[in-house]
Amino acid sequence: MEFPESNLMQTLPKQFFAALVAKVNKKIAEGYDVINLGQGNPDQPTFDYIIEGLKEAAERPINNKYSQFRGQPTFKKACAAFYQEKYGVELDSEKEICVLGGSKIGLVELPWALMNPGDTIILPDPGYPDYLSGVALGQVKLETVPLKAENDFLPDYDDIPEDVAKKAKFIYLNYPNNPTGAVATREFWEKTVAFAKKYNVGVVSDFAYGALGFDGYKNPSFLETPGAKDVGIELYTFSKTFNMAGWRLAFAAGNQEMIEALNLIQDHLFVSVYPAVQDAGIVALESPERDPEIAKLVALYQSRRDAFVNAAEKIGWHAFKSGGTFYAWMTVPKGYTSEQFADVLLNEAHVAVAPGKGFGEAGDGYVRIGLLVSPERLVEAVERIDKLNLFEKE
């Protein structure tokens, strides 16, 4: 008996990082010391106070029961209070917050929940590859807006053709940005709200790296912008802020209709997140240890960025100096595609990087570096690459 995949399943894109991981693992199995800068998996432990919060929550018998379908009210209130404190945004915890088992779930669900097959969505190029999963599952039409170095990797809304803007139903934006490390300004978000209102386009702000701003920069929330809740939502994950990537905890906040649609689809897919994890999330948000721990984490990532970029510049390898996230967006030398360059680095220097083309056609002149190893290993990676003589030192 055969069990062929459905037509819908056959439209799903291949997992970009799966192929990269396979290549890296093959080299490691062959006995090579690979410096893996290709992935975006936080390397630091979850803050101790959150671990203790989970231990206590796991021992409460009530947390062994099913969670409430739309999440624990106490957790949603903590999320609303956090946004009020950090960004001055007032949220109704029951109507304007949706609990998610990781922000990826919300990003992939949204086209199912709020779009019809054939509707148009605008995605940034380059952008987070898993946005494409939602495009495929929602059977929607994809248009892209390029993120260009000359515009600090922010979309220029004039680059979106009038006919595309008029038919688009949603646009996804992600700042601080994966893969470029670019950050958004309040002025940019004001332009975004104006664009959304002019063309009746819903905005989805992926704020995964919101806490990670370098050189003293505090990343503004899209929802801080006047009129933002009229046109969109923002997704906030605990993965990067609190080193909780494996815990799968996030929330969406903002426009009531969009939040209700996400809640409704989740009623049919999940029974929310393990209650003890939600309780630990409350501890993460409310503890007086929160801000000092986050500040130490940001300083760590910034020191890694500086170590890597400074070493790279010395060998003639140029970067867009990231204003946030834990990535560096590096140029590819002439004569190579991003995939060819990544293969050379892995095979000859035993350094793994993510080819920019994996994030979109506009990313092909770059590779993404994950700043998720020690400064010493980052500098060692540059030293290995220097021996390949691929760059012209200035």
Predicted regions and their residues:
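Conserved core segment of the aminotransferase class I/II
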Residues: 224-299, 306, 310, 389-390
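PLP-dependent enzyme catalytic core of the Aspartate aminotransferase-like
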Residues: 81, 335, 344-354, 359-394
